[in-house]
A protein has these predicted regions:
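Upstream accessory/linker segments immediately N-terminal to the RecA-like ATPase cores of bacterial MutS
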Residues: 1-124
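C-terminal helicase module of SF1/SF2 nucleic-acid helicases/translocases
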Residues: 32, 95, 314-334, 338-489, ...
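Motif I (Walker A/P-loop) of helicase-class P-loop NTPases
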Residues: 152-160
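Conserved SF1/SF2 helicase motif Ia
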Residues: 159-178, 182
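Conserved helix-turn-beta segment of the N-terminal RecA-like "Helicase ATP-binding" lobe
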Residues: 180-203
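Conserved helicase motor
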Residues: 199-209, 227-232, 357-366, 385-389
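Conserved motor-coupling elements within RecA-like helicase/translocase cores
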Residues: 206-223, 365-379
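Post-DEXD/H (motif II) to motif III coupling segment of the RecA-like Helicase ATP-binding lobe
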Residues: 242, 249-302
Length: 500
């Protein structure tokens, strides 16, 4: 816990002690050198939860100035970061741009190709985003929606409005797999306009890259899907109007700031199921506009989630239950080196199933082939690293098994779980971990949080839990935990008036 005046100590117990002929309750805290502090229960407001893993934690010393010096240092750092943050926001807010002007009739033609009925939340997000494009100020909106709730369709509408207004559109994604999926989707939807859509990734050949860069510069390419390849100084645009950052939690602040500083006049939209604490904090503070898509598509069923120590019998049951109902299984490991272990387990269990393997070290053609086989139902199980976290949508795959789940981040686990349950069939997620003796309390808590949030649309609440577990970190994101560990998240919030 953190005492407002004395700093970080350890809660021991609540004691009943006789004082002046009456019994009172005290909170017993331990500080460095085993010094004890008894806090009257009526002064409970003076302490708060520390909120971080206590491994290697050094308690404060009673009577020392260390705590006050740390608080002062963090306050100064927050003030510096807040000033920088506000300066950047004010700079963009002071820019005047030409509102986008598009044909609603043409946009309606584009919308008709959407195969589903929009939810109310989705329509609201689309309406607000399109309204942003018609303003004289650059947009800066976070669209937070659960996995499979329709964020991509919002991006497609934004892209169409941008294209119809005569501007170029870019969507940047974290993985080549997601880039491939978006490439297929965008080309299909924009085929009615004969729009030039290009994809730029690490698999793009030098010849293709040269042609794409030339097309972006002279305006021949109107829509670009790009991975981290976009963060290069040699990329120039003829008339860039809008940038969408998909899975924004996957990108570093330097990368995002690079694009904004290079193109200060563009509209910016960020898509995320589980926004990083910094982005969520910025939205909660009003520095970004926020749209939440919290309504699931019709007939969607929540995913049953189990957290448990790995046992062969559980592994066997999970696979056979899914295969017996004609479904498919995702098996995910944290490292490529873990894949042989899973293959060996499958052999030990003598399961008569077909499976494929996918990971980032494979060639593009190999990755495409294995995912195409899984998509077409030619193989029953896919063993992979977290490259499936984004960019694969298979309605027949409704069981997810994750090995060493404690090694993944909370948002990673949430994204991975979103690979299943994308139809009206009940889906299951099994988060296997090592013995509870071998993993720390924070990792176990993280897994339990995910299991607790089974309901559809729980991504925003889960991001808030992540905010509490990890802290907001540096407001500008140059350090994910930043100085918050020095004083705890609660005390960081106590200084948030600095931002205003």
């Amino acid at each position: 816990v953190v005492h407002h005046k004395h700093g970080i100590g350890r809660f021991i117990s609540i004691d009943r002690i006789d004082v002046d002929r009456r019994t009172r309750e005290f909170i017993r805290l331990i500080y460095r050198n085993n010094d004890k502090l008894l806090l009257p229960i009526e002064n409970l407001n003076l302490i708060s939860r520390y909120g971080f893993d206590d491994n290697n934690l050094i308690l404060d010393k009673l009577g020392s100035n260390d705590w006050l010096l740390r608080k002062s240092s963090v306050k100064k750092r927050i003030k510096f970061l807040a000033n920088k943050l506000i300066k950047n926001a004010a700079k963009r807010d002071s820019i005047n741009i030409n509102p986008l002007n598009y044909s609603q009739l043409e946009l309606d033609k584009f919308n008709e190709k959407f195969e589903f009925i929009e939810t109310e939340d989705q329509l609201t997000a689309i309406e607000k985003s399109l309204n942003d494009l018609t303003q004289e100020k650059p947009a800066n909106r976070l669209i937070c929606g659960d996995v499979g709730f329709g964020k991509t369709e919002v991006a497609l509408r934004i892209a169409c409005a941008t294209y119809l207004s005569g501007y170029q559109f870019v969507i940047v994604v974290p993985t080549t797999l997601l880039a491939l999926q978006h490439s297929r989707t965008f080309k299909s939807r924009f085929s009615i306009f004969n729009t030039s859509v290009a994809t730029l990734s690490r698999f793009t050949s030098l010849k293709e890259k040269k042609q794409i860069l030339e097309g972006l510069k002279n305006g021949d390419i109107q829509i670009l899907i790009a991975t981290h390849s976009l963060f290069k100084k040699d990329i120039e645009f003829d008339n860039l109007g809008t940038l969408v950052i998909d899975e924004e939690q996957k990108f570093g602040v330097d990368q995002k700031e690079f694009l904004i500083n290079k193109h200060p006049h563009i509209h910016l939209f960020s898509l995320s199921a589980t926004p990083i604490p910094r982005t969520l904090q910025m939205s909660l503070l009003g520095l970004k506009d926020l749209s939440v898509i919290g309504t699931p598509p019709s007939n969607r069923i929540s995913i049953r989630t189990y957290v448990q120590k790995y046992e062969q019998v559980s592994f066997l049951t999970a696979i056979t239950n899914e295969i017996s109902r004609g479904g498919q299984v995702f098996i995910v490991v944290p490292r490529i080196s873990n894949i042989p272990f899973v293959e060996n387990e499958l052999k030990k269990l003598q399961l008569d199933i077909s499976y494929g393997v996918g990971h980032s070290k494979m060639k593009e053609k190999e990755i495409e082939d294995v995912f195409l086989s899984f998509t077409n139902g030619d193989i029953q199980c896919l063993i992979s690293t977290n490259i499936i976290e984004s960019g694969i949508d298979i309605k027949n795959a409704n069981t997810l098994i994750i090995f060493n789940s404690n090694l993944f981040g909370l948002s990673q686990l949430y994204q991975l779980r979103g690979r299943v349950g994308r139809s009206n069939r009940r889906a299951y997620a099994y988060l296997f971990h090592d013995s509870e003796k071998l993993i720390n309390k924070t990792a176990l808590k993280k897994l339990q949080v995910l299991a607790n949030y089974e309901n559809l649309g729980s991504n925003f609440q889960l991001a808030n839990e992540d905010l509490e577990i990890r802290g907001a970190g540096n407001l500008l994101g140059d350090e994910q935990s930043g100085h918050v560990k020095a004083v705890s998240y609660t005390h960081l919030r106590a200084h948030e008036t600095t931002v205003y």
